[in-house]
Curated annotation (Swiss-Prot):
Its EC number is 2.7.1.148. GO terms for molecular function: 4-(cytidine 5'-diphospho)-2-C-methyl-D-erythritol kinase activity; ATP binding. This is 4-diphosphocytidyl-2-C-methyl-D-erythritol kinase. Disulfide bonds: none annotated. Pathway: Isoprenoid biosynthesis; isopentenyl diphosphate biosynthesis via DXP pathway; isopentenyl diphosphate from 1-deoxy-D-xylulose 5-phosphate: step 3/6. It comes from Thermodesulfovibrio yellowstonii (strain ATCC 51303 / DSM 11347 / YP87). Pfam families: GHMP_kinases_C, GHMP_kinases_N. Catalyzes the phosphorylation of the position 2 hydroxy group of 4-diphosphocytidyl-2C-methyl-D-erythritol. Keywords: ATP-binding, Isoprene biosynthesis, Kinase, Nucleotide-binding, Transferase. The active site is at K9, D131.
């Protein structure tokens, strides 16, 4: 039996460069894991079973897709029982399903004694979902391509965030489709790449008083969901240094000086799903 944590993520920045011939988009993003996590328990079994409170079909669960993808790649027909205890909300832009899938691949690689390397697990994960490869290289990475090109970085300073999620979710597919219709995508790769590295350097050094966060998906999301903009503004009023939509949403995070300040801000968001979290640093615990 194995018990594993599947950590959530936030995007400090996302630039969408272009739509690809395969229907995906080329992006460049700075992503970091946070200490909010799901818990997965893996037990040897004759067949695939997933025990969870999620009200979705087993076949649509990324954990199930990860198991099947690993079986197909290796030819192994072993089963597994997975007990999935969710803390990361669905449709939140926090990568919960993707993290669960990556955690499943890593756990079964150990449980089934497959001895696959990270590169192989990365490739299997990328065939299931675009965000999955990041979760093999925590805690912080620059992610490019459709999410399958990952550059791991180092960081030793942890930051306090307040996560606020309204009572609706946002479809990633919708967010990108709407972006295509309403936004002229930039192709200034060198400029964007430099901005991403500047942002990383600010985070690495702890100089976050005058740094800039951005998310190309925000514009179309804010037009359809004005409540997101309201949350962003309220986070600033509550003392956050900055606030941003994570991924395609619907979670917004605010960056605070410390945990005390973030907890004080909770009173502004009664009725919302909220969590005070820390960004993860090396070594992971």
């Amino acid at each position: 039996m194995l018990t594993c944590k599947a950590f959530a993520k936030i995007n400090w920045a996302i630039s969408v460069l272009k739509k690809r011939d395969d229907g995906y988009h080329d992006i460049i993003s700075l992503m970091q894991a946070i200490d909010l996590h799901d818990t997965l328990i893996f037990k040897s079994s004759q067949k695939i079973e997933i025990e969870t409170d999620l009200l979705i079909k087993k076949e649509n669960n990324l954990v199930y897709k990860a198991i099947k993808a690993l079986q197909n790649y290796t030819g192994i027909k072993k089963g597994v029982t997975v007990i999935l205890k969710k803390e990361i909300p669905l449709g939140a832009g926090l990568g919960g399903g993707s993290s669960d899938a990556a955690t499943t691949l890593k756990a079964l690689n150990e449980l089934w004694q497959l001895n696959l390397d990270i590169k192989t697990l990365h490739e299997i994960g990328a065939s299931i979902g675009s965000d999955i490869p990041f979760f093999f290289y925590l805690p912080i990475c620059i992610v490019e391509g459709r999410g399958d090109v990952v550059k791991p970085l180092k960081i030793s300073k942890s930051y306090t965030l307040l996560l606020v999620k309204p009572d609706f979710s946002i479809s990633t597919e919708w967010a990108y489709k709407t972006l295509d219709l309403k936004t002229e995508l930039t192709t200034e790769y060198e400029k964007i790449n430099n901005n991403i590295w500047q942002l990383y350097n600010h985070l690495y050094s702890g100089d976050v008083d005058n740094f800039y966060l951005w998310n190309d998906l925000e514009k179309s999301v804010l037009e359809k969901y004005p409540e997101i903009d309201k949350i962003k503004r309220k986070l600033i009023e509550a003392g956050a240094k900055s606030s941003l939509l994570s991924g395609s949403g619907s979670t917004v995070f605010g960056l605070f000086n410390n945990k005390t300040d973030a907890q004080k801000a909770l009173k502004f968001f009664e009725g919302y799903w909220c969590r005070v979290v820390q960004t993860l640093v090396e070594p992971l615990k």
